Protein backbone atom coordinates (compact mmCIF):
# COMPACT_ATOMS: atom_id res chain seq x y z
CA UNK A 1 0.00 0.00 0.00
CA UNK A 2 1.27 3.47 -0.79
CA UNK A 3 1.92 6.07 1.86
CA UNK A 4 -1.01 8.46 1.87
CA UNK A 5 -2.04 11.07 4.42
CA UNK A 6 -0.61 11.30 7.91
CA UNK A 7 -2.60 9.84 10.77
CA UNK A 8 -4.82 12.81 11.55
CA UNK A 9 -5.75 13.67 7.96
CA UNK A 10 -8.56 12.41 5.76
CA UNK A 11 -7.52 10.32 2.76
CA UNK A 12 -7.92 11.70 -0.74
CA UNK A 13 -10.78 9.25 -1.42
CA UNK A 14 -13.41 8.02 1.06
CA UNK A 15 -12.58 4.64 2.55
CA UNK A 16 -14.53 1.65 1.27
CA UNK A 17 -15.25 -0.06 4.57
CA UNK A 18 -16.98 -3.06 3.03
CA UNK A 19 -13.87 -3.72 0.95
CA UNK A 20 -11.73 -3.20 4.04
CA UNK A 21 -13.86 -5.75 5.89
CA UNK A 22 -12.78 -8.38 3.36
CA UNK A 23 -9.14 -7.71 4.27
CA UNK A 24 -9.74 -9.08 7.80
CA UNK A 25 -10.57 -12.82 7.76
CA UNK A 26 -11.73 -12.70 11.39
CA UNK A 27 -14.78 -10.77 10.20
CA UNK A 28 -15.95 -13.90 8.35
CA UNK A 29 -15.81 -16.15 11.42
CA UNK A 30 -17.30 -14.03 14.21
CA UNK A 31 -18.64 -10.66 15.22
CA UNK A 32 -15.34 -9.78 16.84
CA UNK A 33 -15.86 -6.61 18.89
CA UNK A 34 -12.96 -7.06 21.30
CA UNK A 35 -10.30 -5.14 19.39
CA UNK A 36 -9.23 -3.31 22.54
CA UNK A 37 -7.85 -6.65 23.76
CA UNK A 38 -6.13 -7.79 20.58
CA UNK A 39 -6.70 -6.72 16.99
CA UNK A 40 -6.83 -9.33 14.20
CA UNK A 41 -4.21 -9.14 11.46
CA UNK A 42 -5.16 -8.09 7.96
CA UNK A 43 -4.41 -10.28 4.96
CA UNK A 44 -1.70 -7.77 4.02
CA UNK A 45 0.13 -8.07 7.36
CA UNK A 46 -0.28 -11.83 7.30
CA UNK A 47 1.21 -12.05 3.81
CA UNK A 48 4.15 -9.84 4.81
CA UNK A 49 4.78 -12.00 7.86
CA UNK A 50 4.65 -15.16 5.74
CA UNK A 51 7.23 -13.68 3.36
CA UNK A 52 9.56 -13.04 6.27
CA UNK A 53 9.07 -16.52 7.74
CA UNK A 54 9.70 -18.01 4.30
CA UNK A 55 12.96 -16.05 4.12
CA UNK A 56 13.93 -17.31 7.59
CA UNK A 57 13.33 -20.86 6.40
CA UNK A 58 14.87 -20.74 2.95
CA UNK A 59 16.72 -17.51 2.31
CA UNK A 60 18.75 -16.42 5.34
CA UNK A 61 21.83 -14.62 4.10
CA UNK A 62 20.32 -13.80 0.70
CA UNK A 63 20.19 -10.86 1.17
CA UNK A 64 21.68 -10.31 4.58
CA UNK A 65 19.92 -8.58 7.51
CA UNK A 66 20.20 -4.99 6.21
CA UNK A 67 17.50 -5.79 3.66
CA UNK A 68 14.99 -6.32 6.47
CA UNK A 69 16.34 -3.38 8.45
CA UNK A 70 14.64 -1.21 5.86
CA UNK A 71 11.26 -2.56 6.97
CA UNK A 72 12.16 -1.76 10.56
CA UNK A 73 13.24 1.79 9.70
CA UNK A 74 10.13 2.32 7.60
CA UNK A 75 7.90 1.26 10.50
CA UNK A 76 9.73 3.71 12.75
CA UNK A 77 9.18 6.55 10.29
CA UNK A 78 5.53 5.68 9.73
CA UNK A 79 4.86 5.67 13.47
CA UNK A 80 6.70 8.97 13.93
CA UNK A 81 4.49 10.51 11.25
CA UNK A 82 1.38 9.02 12.87
CA UNK A 83 1.99 10.88 16.13
CA UNK A 84 3.69 13.95 14.58
CA UNK A 85 7.12 13.26 16.06
CA UNK A 86 10.61 13.18 14.57
CA UNK A 87 12.04 9.79 13.67
CA UNK A 88 14.95 10.38 16.09
CA UNK A 89 12.41 10.62 18.92
CA UNK A 90 11.10 7.07 18.36
CA UNK A 91 12.57 3.91 19.90
CA UNK A 92 11.43 0.32 19.63
CA UNK A 93 10.07 -1.43 22.73
CA UNK A 94 8.63 -4.84 23.55
CA UNK A 95 5.64 -3.51 25.47
CA UNK A 96 4.09 -0.33 26.82
CA UNK A 97 4.88 -1.20 30.43
CA UNK A 98 8.50 -2.04 29.60
CA UNK A 99 8.91 1.25 27.76
CA UNK A 100 7.43 3.23 30.63
CA UNK A 101 9.59 1.35 33.14
CA UNK A 102 12.70 2.22 31.14
CA UNK A 103 11.68 5.86 31.19
CA UNK A 104 11.13 5.80 34.96
CA UNK A 105 14.46 4.07 35.52
CA UNK A 106 16.17 6.65 33.33
CA UNK A 107 14.52 9.47 35.27
CA UNK A 108 15.67 8.21 38.68
CA UNK A 109 17.73 11.31 39.44
CA UNK A 110 14.99 13.63 38.24
CA UNK A 111 12.29 11.79 40.21
CA UNK A 112 14.24 11.60 43.49
CA UNK A 113 12.46 13.31 46.36
CA UNK A 114 9.37 14.05 44.31
CA UNK A 115 6.00 12.57 43.44
CA UNK A 116 4.17 11.14 40.44
CA UNK A 117 0.52 11.98 39.83
CA UNK A 118 -1.74 9.59 37.94
CA UNK A 119 -5.38 8.48 38.06
CA UNK A 120 -7.33 5.27 38.55
CA UNK A 121 -8.40 5.10 34.90
CA UNK A 122 -4.84 4.23 33.91
CA UNK A 123 -3.91 0.67 32.96
CA UNK A 124 -3.71 -1.48 36.11
CA UNK A 125 -0.22 -2.87 35.35
CA UNK A 126 1.05 0.70 35.06
CA UNK A 127 -0.49 1.61 38.42
CA UNK A 128 1.10 -1.47 39.99
CA UNK A 129 4.46 -0.50 38.51
CA UNK A 130 4.19 2.94 40.08
CA UNK A 131 3.01 1.57 43.40
CA UNK A 132 6.08 -0.68 43.69
CA UNK A 133 8.31 2.36 43.27
CA UNK A 134 7.06 3.75 46.55
CA UNK A 135 9.46 1.26 48.13
CA UNK A 136 12.25 3.45 46.74
CA UNK A 137 10.82 6.52 48.44
CA UNK A 138 8.91 7.89 45.47
CA UNK A 139 5.47 9.24 46.38
CA UNK A 140 2.65 8.08 44.10
CA UNK A 141 -0.63 9.99 44.02
CA UNK A 142 -3.53 8.13 42.39
CA UNK A 143 -6.50 10.43 41.81
CA UNK A 144 -9.90 8.65 41.89
CA UNK A 145 -12.29 9.18 38.98
CA UNK A 146 -15.62 10.94 39.31
CA UNK A 147 -18.44 9.31 37.35
CA UNK A 148 -15.86 7.41 35.29
CA UNK A 149 -14.13 10.59 34.19
CA UNK A 150 -10.82 12.13 35.23
CA UNK A 151 -11.33 14.60 38.06
CA UNK A 152 -9.39 17.53 36.62
CA UNK A 153 -9.85 19.65 39.75
CA UNK A 154 -8.39 16.88 41.91
CA UNK A 155 -5.55 16.40 39.43
CA UNK A 156 -4.75 20.10 39.65
CA UNK A 157 -4.75 19.96 43.46
CA UNK A 158 -2.49 16.91 43.42
CA UNK A 159 0.12 18.40 41.07
CA UNK A 160 2.44 20.61 43.09
CA UNK A 161 5.99 21.91 43.12
CA UNK A 162 7.33 18.47 44.05
CA UNK A 163 5.56 16.69 41.19
CA UNK A 164 8.10 15.33 38.75
CA UNK A 165 5.81 13.40 36.42
CA UNK A 166 2.13 13.26 35.49
CA UNK A 167 1.09 10.00 33.84
CA UNK A 168 -2.22 9.21 32.16
CA UNK A 169 -3.66 7.11 29.36
CA UNK A 170 -4.80 9.12 26.35
CA UNK A 171 -7.59 6.55 25.92
CA UNK A 172 -8.53 4.54 29.01
CA UNK A 173 -8.72 0.77 28.64
CA UNK A 174 -11.48 0.85 31.26
CA UNK A 175 -14.13 2.80 29.36
CA UNK A 176 -12.45 4.42 26.36
CA UNK A 177 -12.39 7.87 27.95
CA UNK A 178 -10.18 10.31 26.03
CA UNK A 179 -8.15 12.35 28.50
CA UNK A 180 -7.64 16.07 28.05
CA UNK A 181 -3.88 15.69 27.83
CA UNK A 182 -3.38 19.23 26.55
CA UNK A 183 -4.87 20.60 29.77
CA UNK A 184 -2.88 18.10 31.87
CA UNK A 185 0.29 19.08 30.03
CA UNK A 186 -0.30 22.72 30.87
CA UNK A 187 -0.89 21.86 34.54
CA UNK A 188 2.23 19.71 34.68
CA UNK A 189 4.53 22.09 32.85
CA UNK A 190 3.35 25.07 34.91
CA UNK A 191 4.69 23.28 38.00
CA UNK A 192 7.87 22.00 36.40
CA UNK A 193 6.64 18.44 35.85
CA UNK A 194 6.70 16.31 32.71
CA UNK A 195 3.84 14.40 31.07
CA UNK A 196 3.97 10.71 30.14
CA UNK A 197 1.05 9.39 28.11
CA UNK A 198 0.10 5.75 27.57
CA UNK A 199 -1.17 5.69 23.97
CA UNK A 200 -1.78 1.94 23.84
CA UNK A 201 -5.53 2.31 23.26
CA UNK A 202 -5.15 5.47 21.18
CA UNK A 203 -2.49 4.99 18.50
CA UNK A 204 -4.25 4.09 15.27
CA UNK A 205 -7.69 4.78 16.74
CA UNK A 206 -7.68 8.52 17.42
CA UNK A 207 -5.49 11.32 16.03
CA UNK A 208 -2.35 12.05 18.07
CA UNK A 209 -0.09 15.09 17.81
CA UNK A 210 2.53 14.93 20.55
CA UNK A 211 3.64 18.49 19.80
CA UNK A 212 0.20 20.09 19.91
CA UNK A 213 -0.84 17.99 22.91
CA UNK A 214 2.30 18.86 24.89
CA UNK A 215 3.28 15.22 25.43
CA UNK A 216 6.85 14.71 26.65
CA UNK A 217 6.97 10.91 26.52
CA UNK A 218 4.60 8.23 25.26
CA UNK A 219 4.53 4.50 24.56
CA UNK A 220 2.38 1.79 23.04
CA UNK A 221 2.45 -1.78 21.83
CA UNK A 222 1.23 -2.63 18.35
CA UNK A 223 -1.20 -5.51 18.93
CA UNK A 224 -4.28 -3.38 19.54
CA UNK A 225 -5.27 -0.45 17.29
CA UNK A 226 -1.98 -0.54 15.40
CA UNK A 227 -3.13 -3.99 14.20
CA UNK A 228 0.21 -5.71 14.78
CA UNK A 229 1.60 -8.43 17.01
CA UNK A 230 2.59 -8.74 20.65
CA UNK A 231 6.18 -8.17 21.71
CA UNK A 232 6.66 -5.06 19.58
CA UNK A 233 5.92 -1.41 20.23
CA UNK A 234 7.19 2.13 20.25
CA UNK A 235 8.53 4.66 22.74
CA UNK A 236 8.51 8.41 22.14
CA UNK A 237 10.91 10.66 24.08
CA UNK A 238 11.03 14.36 23.27
CA UNK A 239 14.42 15.22 21.77
CA UNK A 240 15.52 17.76 24.38
CA UNK A 241 14.93 15.25 27.20
CA UNK A 242 17.08 12.51 25.71
CA UNK A 243 20.25 11.72 27.62
CA UNK A 244 19.62 14.50 30.15
CA UNK A 245 16.38 14.25 32.10
CA UNK A 246 15.74 10.78 30.68
CA UNK A 247 18.95 8.77 30.75
CA UNK A 248 19.23 5.31 29.17
CA UNK A 249 18.62 2.62 31.80
CA UNK A 250 20.68 0.12 29.82
CA UNK A 251 23.59 1.48 27.82
CA UNK A 252 23.75 0.52 24.16
CA UNK A 253 26.41 1.24 21.59
CA UNK A 254 29.62 -0.21 20.26
CA UNK A 255 33.41 0.07 20.36
CA UNK A 256 36.26 0.21 17.84
CA UNK A 257 39.93 -0.54 18.55
CA UNK A 258 42.74 1.74 17.47
CA UNK A 259 45.56 -0.80 17.75
CA UNK A 260 46.88 -3.88 16.02
CA UNK A 261 45.75 -6.49 15.14
CA UNK A 262 42.34 -4.76 14.97
CA UNK A 263 43.52 -2.21 12.42
CA UNK A 264 46.58 -1.47 10.33
CA UNK A 265 45.55 2.16 9.98
CA UNK A 266 46.33 3.57 13.38
CA UNK A 267 45.12 7.04 14.27
CA UNK A 268 47.84 8.61 16.45
CA UNK A 269 45.42 11.23 17.79
CA UNK A 270 42.69 8.79 18.80
CA UNK A 271 42.28 6.82 22.00
CA UNK A 272 43.13 3.09 21.88
CA UNK A 273 39.45 2.22 22.40
CA UNK A 274 36.70 4.36 20.94
CA UNK A 275 33.29 4.03 22.57
CA UNK A 276 30.33 5.04 20.41
CA UNK A 277 26.97 5.24 22.21
CA UNK A 278 23.68 4.84 20.39
CA UNK A 279 22.25 8.21 19.50
CA UNK A 280 18.68 9.46 19.51
CA UNK A 281 15.82 7.54 21.06
CA UNK A 282 17.56 4.30 20.12
CA UNK A 283 19.56 4.66 23.34
CA UNK A 284 16.42 3.50 25.19
CA UNK A 285 16.14 0.21 23.34
CA UNK A 286 17.00 -2.70 25.62
CA UNK A 287 16.97 -5.48 23.07
CA UNK A 288 17.21 -6.19 19.37
CA UNK A 289 13.87 -5.29 17.79
CA UNK A 290 11.64 -8.06 16.52
CA UNK A 291 11.64 -8.08 12.74
CA UNK A 292 8.38 -10.01 12.81
CA UNK A 293 6.88 -7.13 14.77
CA UNK A 294 8.46 -4.51 12.53
CA UNK A 295 7.18 -6.13 9.34
CA UNK A 296 3.62 -6.35 10.66
CA UNK A 297 3.82 -2.79 11.99
CA UNK A 298 5.11 -1.50 8.67
CA UNK A 299 2.21 -3.05 6.77
CA UNK A 300 -0.48 -2.04 9.26
CA UNK A 301 0.84 1.52 9.59
CA UNK A 302 0.78 1.89 5.82
CA UNK A 303 -2.84 0.73 5.92
CA UNK A 304 -3.73 3.16 8.73
CA UNK A 305 -2.16 6.08 6.89
CA UNK A 306 -3.95 5.10 3.68
CA UNK A 307 -7.39 4.93 5.29
CA UNK A 308 -6.75 7.84 7.67
CA UNK A 309 -7.17 7.81 11.44
CA UNK A 310 -9.96 10.36 11.27
CA UNK A 311 -11.91 8.12 8.88
CA UNK A 312 -11.26 5.11 11.11
CA UNK A 313 -12.48 7.03 14.15
CA UNK A 314 -15.61 8.28 12.37
CA UNK A 315 -16.48 4.76 11.23
CA UNK A 316 -16.08 3.32 14.73
CA UNK A 317 -18.11 6.19 16.18
CA UNK A 318 -21.05 5.26 13.94
CA UNK A 319 -21.06 1.86 15.65
CA UNK A 320 -20.45 2.98 19.23
CA UNK A 321 -23.12 5.70 18.95
CA UNK A 322 -25.70 3.03 18.19
CA UNK A 323 -24.56 0.95 21.16
CA UNK A 324 -24.82 4.00 23.42
CA UNK A 325 -28.46 4.42 22.38
CA UNK A 326 -29.69 0.83 22.27
CA UNK A 327 -27.89 -1.00 25.09
CA UNK A 328 -29.33 1.22 27.87
CA UNK A 329 -32.79 0.22 26.62
CA UNK A 330 -31.81 -3.37 27.42
CA UNK A 331 -30.75 -2.49 30.98
CA UNK A 332 -27.05 -1.82 30.42
CA UNK A 333 -25.66 1.38 31.96
CA UNK A 334 -22.95 3.16 30.01
CA UNK A 335 -19.82 4.31 31.86
CA UNK A 336 -18.45 5.98 28.72
CA UNK A 337 -19.34 9.63 28.02
CA UNK A 338 -21.70 9.99 25.05
CA UNK A 339 -19.53 12.62 23.34
CA UNK A 340 -16.43 10.44 23.59
CA UNK A 341 -14.62 9.84 20.30
CA UNK A 342 -12.65 6.66 20.99
CA UNK A 343 -13.77 3.26 19.62
CA UNK A 344 -14.28 1.83 23.13
CA UNK A 345 -17.55 1.84 25.07
CA UNK A 346 -18.19 0.09 28.38
CA UNK A 347 -21.41 -0.80 30.17
CA UNK A 348 -22.30 -2.01 33.65
CA UNK A 349 -23.93 -5.39 33.08
CA UNK A 350 -26.80 -6.70 35.26
CA UNK A 351 -25.83 -10.38 34.87
CA UNK A 352 -22.29 -10.69 33.44
CA UNK A 353 -22.26 -14.50 33.33
CA UNK A 354 -25.55 -14.74 31.46
CA UNK A 355 -24.61 -11.93 29.08
CA UNK A 356 -21.30 -13.53 28.13
CA UNK A 357 -22.97 -16.92 27.63
CA UNK A 358 -25.51 -15.38 25.24
CA UNK A 359 -22.83 -13.53 23.31
CA UNK A 360 -20.58 -16.56 22.98
CA UNK A 361 -23.48 -18.69 21.77
CA UNK A 362 -24.19 -16.05 19.12
CA UNK A 363 -20.56 -15.86 18.01
CA UNK A 364 -20.03 -12.36 19.41
CA UNK A 365 -16.77 -11.45 21.14
CA UNK A 366 -16.50 -8.66 23.72
CA UNK A 367 -14.56 -8.29 26.97
CA UNK A 368 -15.92 -8.44 30.51
CA UNK A 369 -13.66 -6.48 32.84
CA UNK A 370 -13.70 -5.54 36.52
CA UNK A 371 -16.48 -7.99 37.31
CA UNK A 372 -19.47 -6.50 35.52
CA UNK A 373 -18.07 -4.01 32.99
CA UNK A 374 -18.74 -5.13 29.42
CA UNK A 375 -16.28 -3.47 27.06
CA UNK A 376 -17.13 -3.29 23.36
CA UNK A 377 -14.52 -2.08 20.89
CA UNK A 378 -15.39 -2.06 17.16
CA UNK A 379 -12.72 -1.40 14.58
CA UNK A 380 -12.34 -0.48 10.94
CA UNK A 381 -13.59 -3.84 9.62
CA UNK A 382 -16.69 -4.10 11.83
CA UNK A 383 -20.11 -3.02 10.58
CA UNK A 384 -23.69 -2.52 11.69
CA UNK A 385 -24.42 -6.23 11.17
CA UNK A 386 -21.93 -7.01 13.95
CA UNK A 387 -23.68 -4.54 16.24
CA UNK A 388 -27.08 -6.01 15.36
CA UNK A 389 -25.79 -9.49 16.16
CA UNK A 390 -24.69 -8.30 19.60
CA UNK A 391 -27.95 -6.51 20.34
CA UNK A 392 -30.06 -9.47 19.23
CA UNK A 393 -28.06 -11.80 21.46
CA UNK A 394 -28.63 -9.61 24.51
CA UNK A 395 -32.29 -8.77 23.82
Region spans (language model):
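Pyridoxal 5′-phosphate
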Residues: 1-395
